[in-house]
Amino acid sequence: MIDLAPLARRLAGTPLADWANGLQAQLDTKMAKGHGDLQRWQSALDALPDLQPERIDLLDSFTLQAECNGETRTVLRKALLGLSPWRKGPFNVFGVHIDTEWRSDWKWSRVSPHLDLKGKRVLDVGCGNGYYQWRMLGAGADSVIGVDPNWLFFCQFQAMQRYLPDLPAWHLPFALEDLPANLEGFDTVFSMGVLYHRKSPIDHLLALKDCLVKGGELVMETLVVPGDVHQVLVPEDRYAQMRNVWFLPSVPALELWMRRAGFTDVRCVDVSHTTIEEQRSTEWMRFQSLSDYLDPADHSKTVEGLPAPMRAVIVGRKP
């Protein structure tokens, strides 16, 4: 059982206290419904060897170090491979390098210089396996809660938390819609790689704003296209082989959406093209990846003939 009592204690006396006190029952209900692969993933978690990190780096990477013999490292590697595919990372865990599909550390190096997370209560929406949550703690956040309904990501987070049990990071297997309206308790809210999956992007922005305290900051990272304030791409069917992609705005259009949703001080801090070095298949994620989704003759286009993935980071403040 996942014990959320430390989370409730952490949030006592904050605007999130009432919500936190009800989370254990909400999580237990969700866990009772389960998932067909949960037992297999739990077996992988149970196989993780008992190790105590002697050195922890979350600021410049995710690295845990300790004395670890070859036999123990082999057991560790096998257990972690049992939680494949690994999408976000990389993680270096006692000498086992989890070479994830995404070089999420590259994205973090583009995002983090523009933020001040020291002492902040942070919510990461669509947090994946929690890689960024650990890096947010490394950047000085007071506490980080991630929500993502994917059970494998939940288990991957538990694997890392096994070795960092006292750090104030929690992964809840919930969707944003499972959170109560008007939480208004987080200093910083992240939504990275989520907006284009939403049929109603404005509603998503409004829901994110509801989670923020007054003066809180939204960090929005999403796929964008070139163009002016009127340019928005709606794929006819798939985009880069993904069916669930709805709206890809230009940067000026996204900035307008955020202002219409009530954010102020809206500004774009980064735009970058996703490369096949940043997103690729590895031993830890053996399925298709970006190179399979691009036009083999022209990497500026997807296989559908649409503009290749370009991602922007926009920040804004709740007045």
From Swiss-Prot:
Cross-referenced Gene3D superfamilies: Vaccinia Virus protein VP39 (3.40.50.150)
According to its UniProt record, the EC number is: 2.5.1.-
Ligand binding (carboxy-S-adenosyl-L-methionine): 88, 102, 107, 126, 176-177, 192, 196, 311
Taken from the record, one Pfam family name reads Methyltransf_9
Swiss-Prot/TrEMBL keywords: Transferase, tRNA processing
Give the GO biological process terms: tRNA wobble uridine modification
Q: Which GO terms describe its molecular function?
A: methyltransferase activity; transferase activity, transferring alkyl or aryl (other than methyl) groups
Reactions performed catalytically = carboxy-S-adenosyl-L-methionine + 5-hydroxyuridine(34) in tRNA = 5-carboxymethoxyuridine(34) in tRNA + S-adenosyl-L-homocysteine + H(+)
Record-linked CDD domains: AdoMet_MTases
Q: Which InterPro entries match?
A: CmoB, Mo5U34_MeTrfas-like, SAM-dependent_MTases_sf
Q: Which domain of life is it from?
A: Bacteria
Please describe what this protein does.
Answer: Catalyzes carboxymethyl transfer from carboxy-S-adenosyl-L-methionine (Cx-SAM) to 5-hydroxyuridine (ho5U) to form 5-carboxymethoxyuridine (cmo5U) at position 34 in tRNAs.
Q: Which family does it belong to?
A: Belongs to the class I-like SAM-binding methyltransferase superfamily. CmoB family.
Describe the subunit structure.
Homotetramer.
This chain's protein is named: tRNA U34 carboxymethyltransferase
